[in-house]
Each structure stands twice: as structure tokens, then as C-alpha cells.
Amino acid sequence: RDGAELRCANGSKLRARYVVSAVPFSVLREIDITPALRGDQADAVKRMPYHNQSQVWLRAKKPYWEEDGIEASMWSDGPFTLIRQQIEHDGTRELMSVLAFGPNSRRLDKLPPAERGRIALDYIHKVRPSTVGRLELVGTHSWELVPTIRGCSHQFVPGRGVAWSRAMALPHERLHFAGEHVRRLEVGMESAMETGERAALQILEKLSA
């Protein structure tokens, strides 16, 4: 009654007066919470789906877009939805992110990283011949394969959007919620950080009462 206890995977225990959880619901639903969540909040944590994004990162050794005169980034209806050139703050244009979503990403994730890279390069070479010999693999990443995240971003299911959005960020006993999944605006990590500020202010208000 005077605080909360967290039991960690390594067996250690932590105690605090209040807890802020930014754990995605894709992972939170597998963590025991006592007393249990209730109503629409419990339903959101249990059933909210997450979509995946599998990434292959490439480096352009030469500016292939200057050879064929076409914008470097591309949309595709093939296995990779988006081939996106990263433009850094200093104007560097070497890095390319190759993104697969949904079923395409899950098929890709079953393969070793090197094989994912090979498939991405083969596909880009096929649809954009000017890239042959001008791209090299840097690495791969999949949000769904990260055990503490298990998905790129959350989705609302039909008929539950209003109920979930109203309930899922509400404090539960001494547990408060933050993170991109309880943001109110779709403006990236800035909005996710705002949820942390909101949770902190909720706790400060309780501490000062």
C-alpha cells in the first residue's frame, strides 16, 4: 500500500513509491501486474496488435541517382515497400534504408541477416540497374525480433479505437504509463517523450498532495 515492487527477469527486486512503464503492450501483456488491469485498459494491453518493420541498411559507394537522373528514394509494390535515402545534417547522402512491412517483413525475418541483405540488393539491382556495383550491405534490423519491443508500432482494431485511447494511458494504482503507444499525436519520438512528462507530472501531483 505504501509503494510498488518490481520483480526483474534476473531475479532482483526493486521498490518505489510509483512506477512508470514505457513497455510496449506487445511485451507488457506477458508481464504479471498485481492488482490486474481492468476494463478497456486491460483489453487494450491484451489485444492491441503491433505491425512489423524489417530494415536492411545499405551504403551507396557511388551516387547512382546521378547516373540515371532519378530520385534516389523509391516506393515499390514488391517485397520492399520503401527504399529511402538518408540525408544527414551535413548533407551526406550515403546511407539507404530498405523497408519491408507486414507479411513481407516476417518472411524476411526468418532468414539470417546476410541473406536478408542479399535479397534486398538483388531486388534493388533488378528494379534499378544503375545501383549495380554501387551499394554495399551495412546491416539489418527488425523491431519484431527485439525481445523487449516485439513490433514497430501499435494499431487500433475496428470498434475499439475510442475506448482504448481513453483508457490505456490512465494510471493504474501506483503504475503510470508512457511511451509511443500512449501518445496523443503522431509526431514521432517527441510525442513519446511528452508521455513521459505527463506521467511524471501525474506522480508529482500525487506526491505533493
What is the role of each PLM region?
Residues 40-68:
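Central beta-strand plus flanking loop segment that forms part of the substrate or channel wall
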Residues 4, 12, 26:
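Glycine-centered loop/turn positions within well-structured domains
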Residues 18-40, 57:
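Flavin (primarily FAD) binding-site architecture
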Residues 9-18:
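Core beta-strand elements of the Rossmann-like FAD/NAD(P) dinucleotide-binding domain
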Residues 3-5, 22, 52, 68-209:
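Conserved flavin/dinucleotide-binding core of flavoenzymes
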Residues 35-42, 154-158:
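Short glycine/proline- and charge-enriched loop/turn segments
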Residues 9, 59-61, 101:
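Solvent-exposed residues in well-ordered beta-strands and their adjoining turns
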